């Protein structure tokens, strides 16, 4: 019987989902393994003893972090105490690099093994963080093959586990069945809206999406809109921004993407999820002007959308800051729906993404790495 324990640390909804899948895989490998950590509803449902709720910690940008500083500091102090009083056999840090790299240092100081799941984007900006990773991380579990090569070059122990989204199950229901379930007409165009999972994203992006929707309706009166609500968001949070024609459902992205003809999405992991289902999309994002200015100074990339970053060529138009207007969004969605050649060209490019990222079940692959680290 195992008395080993693993701490899972996730600070965002995407990390919470990865943590939940990882917890399930770990339990199937080692049923008596104790799992605790920081996360959200998904991890809790997967049997993790979540003692820090991460819902308030999912922020992006300097000003936004300052506003949530008290919650972030409290989470850090709680984890430091946990490391000292109840040290686990291993800590798994999932994404969320600003917080997690700092806490990896604290875990290492306490003599705890560290695995980092989902690499910080050091290939995009602040490559110098590789020094911290070398010093404080025992093993990296990365989602992209080019990241594996990067860490191998730097002599950091690493495993390319594949991207979880590339191996996600597809809905068993037919398109007509899903449309019936959502009370949508399968013969009319459907546009999916993904305004993000953070309050700051909702406040900035959802009003634009709603206005863009009204403009699209003037060109395509039969268009239908569907918005899968992120698990960490209450309907009351978005209700003030909604218009009657937008159908809101609770976090059912796979079924939504199975019926959508196009999507409008906040930059983030969801852009890759949409792209892997070969749904043409437009990416939008807005942050505080100072945050954007700092980002432009520091980031070495031409694109911010994850689907564009991992593709040999751009697969989605990005509308950022002042370029993200209702009219610009509506114009691009109209092209994605009505310009047949353009639409087919985009779908063709999207079809090349999955083979690059699929290495089987990513959560099971990470669980095996963890098992080797704590039982070898």
From Swiss-Prot:
HAMAP family (UniProt xref): LpxB
Gene Ontology terms describing biological process: lipid A biosynthetic process
EC class (word): transferase
Pathway this chain belongs to: Bacterial outer membrane biogenesis; LPS lipid A biosynthesis
Family according to the record: Belongs to the LpxB family.
Keywords linked to the UniProt accession: Glycosyltransferase, Lipid A biosynthesis, Lipid biosynthesis, Lipid metabolism, Transferase
Function: Condensation of UDP-2,3-diacylglucosamine and 2,3-diacylglucosamine-1-phosphate to form lipid A disaccharide, a precursor of lipid A, a phosphorylated glycolipid that anchors the lipopolysaccharide to the outer membrane of the cell.
Name of this protein: Lipid-A-disaccharide synthase
The UniProt record lists the keyword Lipid metabolism: yes
GO cellular component: membrane
GO molecular function, one term: phospholipid binding
InterPro entries to which the protein is assigned, alphabetical: Glyco_trans_19 (IPR003835)
Reaction(s) catalysed (UniProt annotation): a lipid X + a UDP-2-N,3-O-bis[(3R)-3-hydroxyacyl]-alpha-D-glucosamine = a lipid A disaccharide + UDP + H(+)
One family name in Pfam for this protein: LpxB
EC numbers on record: 2.4.1.182
